[in-house]
Amino acid sequence: MSHPPLPPQSERRALAIAQAVYEAFEDYHARFSEITARAKQRFETRDWSGAREDAVARIALYDQYIAECMLRLRAVLLGQAHDRALWMRARDHYAALLSGLIDQELYKTFYNTLTRRYFGTHGVDADIEFIALDIEPTDAITVPVARHTYAVSPGRLTDMLVRVLGDYAFAVPYTHRTRCAAAIAVRLLDDLAHWGEHPVRSVELLETVFYRERRAYLVGRVFGEHRFSPCVIALINDEAGLRAEAVLTRRSDVAQLFSNSRSYFQADLSTVGDAVVFLRSLLTHKPVDELYTMLGRAKQGKTERYRTFFSHFQAHPSEQLVHADGTPGMVMVVFTLPSYPLVFKLIRDRFAYPKTMSRAQVEGKYELVFQLDRIGRLLDAQPYRFLRFPKARFSPALLQELQTSCAMSLSEDGDDVLIALCYVQRRLRPLNLYLREQLPEAAHAAALDYGQAIKDMARNNIFPGDMLLKNFGITRHQRAVFYDYDELCLITECNFRDWPVPTTYEEQMAAEPWFHVGPRDVFPERFALFMGLPASQLEAVKHQHPELFDPRWWRDLQSRLREDDYPDTPPYAESRRLA
């Protein structure tokens, strides 16, 4: 909806605001692309440390360019930063500048971020923000994303794949391109044999290569006569050279590759919305917000998550927000809408003993997670500020606890409750509940994967701090994921010690340590006491992952990490690797 024109001088100022914001986003986008484009060279030169630095730098870009834009606007606003009529007209001019753009939603989110900084918006402000809770923006995108398409003649699949690898060339050669192509062909034919004779009729792959950690991915689809499946070819460049390492055709495997418990891809896409539309065809159950986020557009992911949640929230007016299942936390109050798979986490005003950290330290831990390689074991946690909920939508028990335990984060505005800061995560089944609910075989597998999760995190310089089962959840693909970050720290910051051997009867019977324990001291031999696993599952974890309880393993790993020697953690099962 357009607003009436302003007097000529104000109208010119509104147009200047729109142009300045548009140019600021263009500058941000160019810098984002510049960093992302470096991923190819990082992969070719095996510069994994540089790749990690780029990932952190790219996340920080958004707020940097918002701050820079606000500085630019000072000369335009001339003291009228809070003139609502001026911003309403600026929004109209800005919308006109975006006409026809595939990624106009990204531009709108940038604009909204600015107005919220200027006006301190609580909830949403439909007069000056771009708000569309009732539409799915990607539905309007009909332009196909850039891709390569390859037809396959009967018996010529390997030849076609040789051509594919040639089209995706790098500064380093494939160690044996034909052998790689043949291995990919064998895997495709094995995976798709149930499609009948000549199962692979064509393959299409996005022109843009996806990079993350130590791998490059060719992402696309494989078509049979009557159906299609995802097709992701994973490339690795290590001491043995550049080669294809895995092929993923199962949606569950590809979904895990795009899981929101992993770090964001580096994919230098000229436009993003059309790529999201394509990826949705591969991962039909993956929410749009997670796809934007996994492509590095975390702010747009937050916008889409807000849009879809509140659209659902408004469509279910009789459903109340309630405490999430699981053991109540000492640091957070966690609530959910039962029919929607998100949780909202608020920091308590005071923490129960033995928690000793401050509120600022907790916020710092959640910020730290964005800077880490999350390797499929740390759940994305997005901060939201000044969310507005009708007070009547909270269950009485939840509202009472929020008012008494989270007063610093809570305020009331008429019939609404405003939440100054909360962290929003995908809702998972807490591991302690899952183990009680499942049959022995499934519980055994989950316990072993819990041990593997701790090991995977450790190999990427992440120590969970609190290993209790309640701090882990199980995804729909039966993976153990850590989601409670108030005690998380880096492996390189810890002091892994042997548990001293008692020398007297009093020491042997002491309920507390009889020796000095520093704030960073960790005793792996005692982990079993703090995991909370039933005896049979604990023994299975000890048998499968004995190194977790060995201080020497942790110290050796710590030495490697301090030398920037990070062990490789593949994002798929060993069975998916090529012969």
UniProtKB/Swiss-Prot annotation:
NCBIfam families found in the cross-reference section: PRK02946.1
Catalyzed reactions: L-seryl-[isocitrate dehydrogenase] + ATP = O-phospho-L-seryl-[isocitrate dehydrogenase] + ADP + H(+)
Gene Ontology process terms (BP): glucose metabolic process; glyoxylate cycle; tricarboxylic acid cycle
PANTHER family xref list: ISOCITRATE DEHYDROGENASE KINASE_PHOSPHATASE (PTHR39559:SF1), PTHR39559
Entry's Gene Ontology molecular function annotations: [isocitrate dehydrogenase (NADP+)] kinase activity; AMP binding; ATP binding; phosphoprotein phosphatase activity; protein serine/threonine kinase activity
Predominant localisation class: cytoplasm
Positions annotated as active site in the UniProt record: D380
Lineage summary: Bacteria, Pseudomonadati, Pseudomonadota, Gammaproteobacteria, Lysobacterales
Job of this protein: Bifunctional enzyme which can phosphorylate or dephosphorylate isocitrate dehydrogenase (IDH) on a specific serine residue. This is a regulatory mechanism which enables bacteria to bypass the Krebs cycle via the glyoxylate shunt in response to the source of carbon. When bacteria are grown on glucose, IDH is fully active and unphosphorylated, but when grown on acetate or ethanol, the activity of IDH declines drastically concomitant with its phosphorylation.
Record carries keyword Hydrolase: yes
Protein name: Isocitrate dehydrogenase kinase/phosphatase
InterPro entries linked to this entry: AceK_kinase, AceK_regulatory, Isocitrate_DH_AceK
Keywords assigned by UniProt, alphabetized: ATP-binding, Cytoplasm, Glyoxylate bypass, Hydrolase, Kinase, Nucleotide-binding, Protein phosphatase, Serine/threonine-protein kinase, Transferase, Tricarboxylic acid cycle
EC number: 2.7.11.5, 3.1.3.-
GO terms under cellular component: cytoplasm
Encoding gene per record: aceK
Residues annotated to bind ATP: A324, D325, G326, T327, P328, G329, M330, K345
Keyword ATP-binding assigned: yes
Family to which this protein belongs: Belongs to the AceK family.
Location in or out of the cell: Cytoplasm
One matching Pfam family: AceK_regulatory
